[in-house]
From Swiss-Prot:
Its EC number is 1.8.1.2. InterPro entries: CysI, NiRdtase/SiRdtase_haem-b_fer, Nit/Sulf_reduc_fer-like_dom_sf, NO2/SO3_Rdtase_4Fe4S_dom, NO2/SO3_Rdtase_4Fe4S_prot, NO2/SO3_Rdtase_4Fe4S_sf, NO2/SO3_Rdtase_FeS/sirohaem_BS. Alpha(8)-beta(8). The alpha component is a flavoprotein, the beta component is a hemoprotein. GO terms for biological process: cysteine biosynthetic process; hydrogen sulfide biosynthetic process; sulfate assimilation. Belongs to the nitrite and sulfite reductase 4Fe-4S domain family. This is Sulfite reductase [NADPH] hemoprotein beta-component. Binds 1 siroheme per subunit. Induction: Up-regulated by sulfate and the transcriptional regulator CysL. It comes from Bacillus subtilis (strain 168). Pathway: Sulfur metabolism; hydrogen sulfide biosynthesis; hydrogen sulfide from sulfite (NADPH route): step 1/1. It catalyses: hydrogen sulfide + 3 NADP(+) + 3 H2O = sulfite + 3 NADPH + 4 H(+). Its cofactor is siroheme; [4Fe-4S] cluster. GO terms for cellular component: sulfite reductase complex (NADPH). PROSITE patterns: NIR_SIR.
Length: 571
């Protein structure tokens, strides 16, 4: 029985709430405006709705000033994100995405930090053809963005293949069961005829006509690997395995990475474990958690609208009590678990049933051909002969998974022929790096990330080598803005773009993803970054204890205070 009456924040709904309310369940005027050839863009109201269909309108910011001088509209283009729970793609689907990127995109694919594909550079008049082709490959872009449950993540851990297979099936079921029920996507992109007369309450029984106050993210981790950063999720499930069998999941609620520069009422937060559920109870837990956010989330101030703020405002125990009240049963006590890292394991790993997995290092998650490295071509050739699957990891890398023994030699030869790398000749720091897209396509970016981090790493590696730390894993993450797509606050070294060439520098996150970082220096450029890291890494090399990770060292050495909760992130 709930002992405290919960309520949503007071305040007038934001304009986005108006747009959703008037959208006729995410239809708006998208069908009409996508036929318009006068402009390559679309009205803002429709762009807000477009997210729920898996796409954002962007423009090439490298060209923005020049086009303004020429009195031309911005170089509008669309980013399209695929819904692909668990990050698993068949070779046939890989080839379709490769082909679409060449025909309609910018010739590259982005492997995201949520285990899916992003295509950039799609023109408005090519969007429908692109989505229809994706649909023909048994994929879709429904709810890949927007105020709904996003792509459900799942551990890619090759060491527990039998558990991965089972957990992956649960991630797919969860993703499908939590989809919006509106037929808007099918009508606009797939030419489905609208069926009239459906009662409103039947259209979206879980989401309702306003959907959620903000995005909602779910991920499933399989200890000891926290590769999906389970504590960064709105709702995290931690697989509990006993005697080689999956018995259920610990449930964690209230995580999220985004914040706003200069606003201490916004902050990253880690999800807290509140109990345990059996696999067959997972959907019920997810659905009821989502309805709590639907009913009590902040619909007035979008920067405070994520579920983490709802949990912090209402109180963890009150939210747990409300969840159990809606479930009609109580969560079991959480089971013991242990994480020891949140990175990937590179190279060949033997799985079960005579299958092998090869994890490829993909810097920045960008699949393209370089002058001296034909990454995209090599993967295309592998996809033509591969009989297993591809797994996109949460660290923007790629696993060529379930390679049969009789195919291993052929796949190995192609890896060798195209020089595809497991990254082991790079520093462990580079292999533990992650960056969001940022410029030139992201409209929120304040500074470079993906295009700049490799160059910065070249210079940091000189310091690493000087101090004998080349094989020391240190997680380093860079984002072009504070929204946190590359989960900057969980990097032992983190950078958030503040202005062109300027970053806030963060230290002190845990190597296993269980502690947030804290700001160390504000608004600094490359020279200061390198100067600070030279001092810090030198001290780490000399003063660290046996097995001590960098994020732990800077706290023990008094260099930075530990962030014990997101609410003291700014302290």
């Amino acid at each position: 029985m709930v002992t405290k009456i919960l309520k949503a924040p007071d305040g007038s709904p934001s304009d986005v709430e108006r747009i959703k309310k008037e959208s006729d369940y995410l239809r708006g005027t998208l069908k009409e405006v996508m036929l318009d050839r006068i402009s390559a863009g679309i009205p803002d109201d429709d762009n807000r709705l477009m997210k729920h269909h898996g796409s954002y309108l962007q423009d090439d910011r490298d060209l923005r000033n020049e086009r303004q001088k020429q009195k031309l509209e911005p170089a509008y283009q669309f980013m399209l994100r695929v819904r692909m729970p668990g990050g698993v793609s068949t070779p046939e689907q890989w080839l379709v995405m490769d082909d679409l990127s060449q025909k309609y995109g910018n010739g590259t694919l982005k492997l995201t930090t949520r285990e899916t594909f992003q295509m950039h550079g799609i023109l408005k008049w090519n969007m429908k053809k692109t989505i229809q082709t994706i649909h023909s490959a048994l994929l879709d872009t429904i709810a890949a963005c927007g105020d709904v449950n996003r792509n459900v993540m799942c551990a890619s851990n090759p060491y527990q293949s039998e558990i991965h297979s089972e957990v992956y099936e649960w991630s797919k079921k969860l993703s499908d069961d939590l989809l919006p029920r509106t037929r808007a996507y099918h009508e606009i992109w797939l030419d489905e005829e609208r069926v009239a007369g459906t009662p409103e309450e039947e259209v979206e029984p879980m989401y309702g006509p306003l959907y959620l106050p903000r995005k909602f993210k779910i991920g499933i981790a399989v200890p000891p690997s926290n590769d999906i950063d389970v504590f960064s999720q709105d709702l995290g499930f931690i697989a509990i395995v006993e005697d080689g069998k999956l018995i259920g999941f610990n449930v964690a609620i209230g995580g999220g990475m985004g914040m706003t520069h200069g606003d201490t009422a916004t902050y990253p937060q880690l999800a807290k474990v509140i109990g345990f559920c059996r696999p067959e109870q997972m959907y019920d837990v997810a659905e009821k958690t989502i309805t709590i956010q639907r009913d009590y989330g902040n619909r007035s101030v979008r920067k405070n609208a994520r579920f983490k703020y709802t949990v912090d405002r209402l109180g963890l125990e009150n939210v747990k009590e409300e969840l159990e009240n809606r479930l009609g049963w109580s969560l079991e006590e959480a089971k013991p678990y242990h994480f020891d890292h949140n990175g990937d394991r590179y190279g060949w790993v033997e799985g079960i049933e005579d299958k092998w997995h090869f994890t490829l290092f993909v810097e920045g998650g960008r699949i393209t051909d370089y002058d001296d490295y034909k990454l995209m071509t090599g993967l295309r050739e592998i996809a033509k002969v591969h009989t297993g699957e591809f797994r996109l990891t949460a660290n923007q890398n790629l696993m060529i998974a379930n390679v049969s023994s009789d195919k291993k030699e052929e796949i190995s030869a192609l890896i060798e022929q195209y020089g595809l790398t497991d990254g082991k000749h790079y520093s462990a720091l580079r292999r533990s790096s992650m960056a969001c897209v940022a410029l030139p396509t992201c409209g929120l970016a304040m500074a470079e990330a993906e295009r700049y981090l490799p160059t910065l790493l070249d210079k940091i590696e000189e310091i690493i080598d000087e101090n004998g730390l080349r094989d020391q894993e240190i997680t380093i993450r860079m984002t072009g803005c504070p929204n946190g797509c590359a989960r900057h606050a969980l990097g032992e070294i983190g950078f958030i773009g503040k202005a062109p060439g300027k970053y806030n520098m963060y230290l002190g996150a845990a190597f296993d993803g269980s502690r947030l970082s804290k700001m160390y220096r504000e608004n600094i450029g490359e020279a200061d970054i390198l100067s600070e890291l030279r001092i810090l890494l030198s001290r780490y090399a000399k003063e660290r204890e046996e097995g001590e990770h960098f994020g732990d060292f800077v706290i023990r050495a008094g260099i930075i205070k530990a962030t014990t909760d997101g609410t003291n992130f700014h302290d």
